[in-house]
Amino acid sequence: MFSFVDLRLLLLLGATALLTHGQEDIPEVSCIHNGLRVPNGETWKPDVCLICICHNGTAVCDGVLCKEDLDCPNPQKREGECCPFCPEEYVSPDAEVIGVEGPKGDPGPQGPRGPVGPPGQDGIPGQPGLPGPPGPPGPPGPPGLGGNFASQMSYGYDEKSAGVSVPGPMGPSGPRGLPGPPGAPGPQGFQGPPGEPGEPGASGPMGPRGPPGPPGKNGDDGEAGKPGRPGERGPPGPQGARGLPGTAGLPGMKGHRGFSGLDGAKGDTGPAGPKGEPGSPGENGAPGQMGPRGLPGERGRPGPPGSAGARGNDGAVGAAGPPGPTGPTGPPGFPGAAGAKGEAGPQGARGSEGPQGVRGEPGPPGPAGAAGPAGNPGADGQPGAKGANGAPGIAGAPGFPGARGPSGPQGPSGAPGPKGNSGEPGAPGNKGDTGAKGEPGPAGVQGPPGPAGEEGKRGARGEPGPSGLPGPPGERGGPGSRGFPGADGVAGPKGPAGERGSPGPAGPKGSPGEAGRPGEAGLPGAKGLTGSPGSPGPDGKTGPPGPAGQDGRPGPAGPPGARGQAGVMGFPGPKGTAGEPGKAGERGVPGPPGAVGPAGKDGEAGAQGAPGPAGPAGERGEQGPAGSPGFQGLPGPAGPPGEAGKPGEQGVPGDLGAPGPSGARGERGFPGERGVQGPPGPAGPRGNNGAPGNDGAKGDTGAPGAPGSQGAPGLQGMPGERGAAGLPGPKGDRGDAGPKGADGSPGKDGVRGLTGPIGPPGPAGAPGDKGETGPSGPAGPTGARGAPGDRGEPGPPGPAGFAGPPGADGQPGAKGEPGDTGVKGDAGPPGPAGPAGPPGPIGNVGAPGPKGSRGAAGPPGATGFPGAAGRVGPPGPSGNAGPPGPPGPVGKEGGKGPRGETGPAGRPGEVGPPGPPGPAGEKGSPGADGPAGSPGTPGPQGIAGQRGVVGLPGQRGERGFPGLPGPSGEPGKQGPSGASGERGPPGPMGPPGLAGPPGESGREGSPGAEGSPGRDGAPGAKGDRGETGPAGPPGAPGAPGAPGPVGPAGKNGDRGETGPAGPAGPIGPAGARGPAGPQGPRGDKGETGEQGDRGIKGHRGFSGLQGPPGSPGSPGEQGPSGASGPAGPRGPPGSAGSPGKDGLNGLPGPIGPPGPRGRTGDSGPAGPPGPPGPPGPPGPPSGGYDFSFLPQPPQEKSQDGGRYYRADDANVVRDRDLEVDTTLKSLSQQIENIRSPEGSRKNPARTCRDLKMCHSDWKSGEYWIDPNQGCNLDAIKVYCNMETGQTCVFPTQPSVPQKNWYISPNPKEKKHVWFGESMTDGFQFEYGSEGSDPADVAIQLTFLRLMSTEASQNITYHCKNSVAYMDQQTGNLKKSLLLQGSNEIELRGEGNSRFTYSTLVDGCTSHTGTWGKTVIEYKTTKTSRLPIIDVAPLDIGAPDQEFGMDIGPACFV
């Protein structure tokens, strides 16, 4: 319900917006009242009858005014409220019984012309609210429409009659007859000519409610009624369609600091901050668990030459060779772990002021202007000739009784006419006895709203309304400024074991430790050299299958799981203090015009601006999709107030307000024409006979009085509630670099770098334990000392040193040449406002704007202070009938009527002839109240009223337009160091390292306890300059440099086109009152006046109350991205951060040179039997057996050394012995291969994870696997990452050439096109090693997926003028690629998070004409989705759009 208070609130809001424009912030103060501290601008109620506001440190309090004389016997008072009230069912005893409806009066004289109202279109009706409580009784209603003719009146009214009799023609009046019984109502007669105005009849009873009439024209604005009680809250209306954009208003003042918002979710990753100083070394940790076997130590100092030993072990890797030339770009690496989110970057530079936006569409007409000063009354015009009878007008209010006409001559007696109307009231009879109290009459028709009463005191603060329904989610906020450091977190879990430190200095020798427990069995020794092959033995019989192997060891921990869902939003953080403003940065390039914002709140009507040139209408862009909600950013600083929106359309008429109290009696109006004869009133008590007066002449209707002058402005109202935050302004100028932050904690793990070249040999280690004495070799001759070697190739560059201190600022550069004349600039923004000009002429009424859709109902705001009096609103629709109003003032005494018949009410006998006037009687009891007098003609405008009480805060405004860019904020304080991140998962294998020098073989020592980390070594000498490496990835943005010197002024550009009209200034102060001119006829439509100067800055208003949050508006369309500003000068280097953790392992190094010969291997298996020996010597002469071949028990002192199944002499070795030996060795080898497969073609493993578990020290590389087991002929070759246990299957064709693959038949119709399915020469991706059967690979992949819990794959999309993921122009992902998984599921860039991929690098965001690349990564636990078999780009099809791809391996673990 739009009440009087609402109107005042709207005006007060508008006034506050003007007053606060341009004023500086007042420092926040608070008030202390009765020990209670209250923030500035806050209101509170110390008790129910007192309301206070804190205004700049002073508590301003006012009592709640209550109506003093309540018209009911038992006023009631609610708990917690100050004012008593009448119960709703109470009816005032003064309510009079209303008589029969009076006759219809003639139309009143034409009123003065009202100001032209804005013809608004009706809005869509909202859903009806719940009914409010009944209002107080209204004033008396106007007289009802009368009956039609005397013939009708003669039939009377009978409740029970149903028939209708037709009236006869009107005859001459006969003598007055007795009152007849009530007749049936007659039918509606035709409209007769209007009669002379009759005496006003008494009020009739309330008629039945008629059908609703057609909507009338908008009447003149009526006085605003007193605010009614608020109704119960209606259900929220439906979300309206988005309104048309309004004209941008002037930028508003910077608003007060907003209250702290809730802590947002973590913002987007900012660029990396400057590297902090290295942290101090931590304390020594507790000794870790025993580590794996260490690498061989450096070569010891040369000992004296010993005798030549046996061949040593393979040597260590040789020193680094010179770096090789940069190789071609490899296929995409294996997916790394997702990096931790970086800290928020510094605030960007402020962009330059953008050009003036395009002219908005014409707004709806503004509200009517304030009434101008009244002219003096014009001279009386000549009386015009009588016009023809007009069509019957709407019944006017009854006029005052006209002067009585002279009696006409007596006419001839006519035939008796039908029964006449009841006669005029007779001379008053003597006072009769008091009649019995009548039944209460029915409620009368609701009267029109009474005139506005005097302004009441401030009402009690209402209770807060119920919470509204949650609004739709708002748009994603821009990244907020960096928050204050949070409280220290709880101690994190123990981090992983650090890397092994460099050796510390040797400690003092410890006391001997206790004897250790027996060590575990050592790892199997390295495989010995293969023995020379024996001659082939006979094929053995197939042995029985061996026993099943033991279960393998448990695998290593899997990689970190997928990122969890976002946690619950935390509690709001404490309010941050404002940073000092930073220096202004350089002006950026103008950005493109922003998208039109949502319509703002109605602004004050400004002076008419000069018409600007009409711009061409642009096509409406398509609605962008709603982005997925981002994590909520930290609260941004309060933006400047949004620009004022264009005026809204005429709203739907509000519900009828509760009738106001009866106004003071108006001055007497001029007499109206004679009305139709009214029905008889009830007989009054008999009065004294008065002497007849002389008839006065009828006067002419006077001209309407001149309107009064405009009242003095009211007191400054309280400011309205804080408006919703405007849309983020354009990017501000870039602030200066902030002060150097405190040293950061060690950064999170970096992405694992490529394997660096092998470093120079470290310092000599402590002497190792003495090795076991080798077998003495023959002493070699001492060699001569070698000549010094040539200087080696320059080593690789050393690690980057710590950054030096920033250099001194350079001298300003020489003044540059003047630039070429620029192209004609866009129209600039409006200049600053000039001083207030005189008021311009009233402009034409604007065309009605298009009808806006109804917005959603906002939640109720807190009750504000009363607003200033609003302008008169248009009349509302007729209300329902109200109860009878209070009695009107007593009417002026009418002229004496002719003597009537004896009324039925008199008890005395018939009335005698009139006697002489008697003495004055006693004062009679009050007569029944007369009917309400007709409204007089409007009097002159009264003098201005006193200033009203400070108004309540206005309703919350709609969301403003984006404000102008705010000044750059000062760099935030350095945040606390973040906790060290956990170590990331191992990266992919690096390239082979260079071969190292051979080390001497040492005896394998027992593992020592882990030493404490040594101190950092001294920096090495600077190496020679290396060759230029390939370009690295773009670095983090440097801190902004100091601003350069101001350049010379450029030449003047061409004169720009006329800019659009500036926004209207506020209404100037009223001029001095001029002499009144005569009222002229309505002039022709004037031309649009020139634009007035902008008004002066108003006073600052009080702080408004904090309003509840408004419903979020519907998201606007995605604006185009602004042009990038020029890169700032390079900032000084930051201090070096603490060293990050070790990067991931590099790729395998190249194969080193062959090591020295290994130790002699174990004895090989016995060879096959040799050829038969030569014949033996002759046997003994006897013919007996040689018992030496039979099994003999071993003898302690056997002379011939006979053995059990063994013979010392080679000649007597049995073939059977060799066969058994060979078979046993072969079987044990096969069993060992089953239990610990080698990953070779003949002995494939099941997965790389199995290989890693059995051979944890093996290097990453290519191995053979057979996931389905069985025959090994279908084994496939894969890449095993031995650090992670991943099994990676490469595509058979890993790259797609970079060229134009597709020309679209319809370039405007963009759709996804599958590379393998729909493009000429395209193909679906197949996987496996070279020469493998695709069917075998498919089966093996099926088994591999079953044995894996996670899969990942990267694809690199090379692009030229083709968007792969994010479209920089629209900021959305609609043009992202589609990927097809092995199970034919489509993976997208946006949508359901279960089927979306992410990007590691996104260099294909716009059409630049150069090649870029986007690296796509997809990780999933649904292993059946990988590998990817097809890709569908969308942004292709034009001749200049080209692409290519690198397909990475699919890795399973």
UniProtKB/Swiss-Prot annotation:
UniProt-annotated stretches for the region Triple-helical region: 168-1181
Subunit note: Trimers of one alpha 2(I) and two alpha 1(I) chains. Interacts with MRC2. Interacts with TRAM2. Interacts with MFAP4 in a Ca (2+)-dependent manner.
GO cellular component: collagen trimer; collagen type I trimer; collagen-containing extracellular matrix; cytoplasm; extracellular matrix; extracellular region; extracellular space; secretory granule
Record-linked Pfam families: COLFI, Collagen, VWC
Tissue: Forms the fibrils of tendon, ligaments and bones. In bones the fibrils are mineralized with calcium hydroxyapatite.
Record-level Gene Ontology MF annotations: extracellular matrix structural constituent; extracellular matrix structural constituent conferring tensile strength; identical protein binding; metal ion binding; platelet-derived growth factor binding; protease binding
Carbohydrate-modified residues: N56, K254, K1097, N1354
Keyword Secreted: yes
Modification 3-hydroxyproline occurs at: P874, P1153, P1168, P1171, P1174
Organismal lineage: Eukaryota, Metazoa, Chordata, Craniata, Vertebrata
UniProt keyword list: Calcium, Collagen, Disulfide bond, Extracellular matrix, Glycoprotein, Hydroxylation, Metal-binding, Phosphoprotein, Pyrrolidone carboxylic acid, Repeat, Secreted, Signal
Family according to the record: Belongs to the fibrillar collagen family.
Sites of 5-hydroxylysine modification: K254, K419, K494, K740, K851, K1022, K1085, K1097
Propeptide residue interval(s): 23-151, 1208-1453
Pyrrolidone carboxylic acid sites (modified residues): Q152
Limits of the VWFC domain: 29-87
Annotated positions of the Phosphoserine modification: S161, S260, S776
Protein name per UniProt: Collagen alpha-1(I) chain
Residue ranges annotated as motif Cell attachment site: 734-736, 1082-1084
Modification type Allysine: residues: K160, K1197
GO biological process: blood vessel development; bone trabecula formation; cartilage development involved in endochondral bone morphogenesis; cellular response to amino acid stimulus; cellular response to epidermal growth factor stimulus; cellular response to fibroblast growth factor stimulus; cellular response to fluoride; cellular response to glucose stimulus
Annotated region described as Nonhelical region (N-terminal), given as residue ranges: 152-167
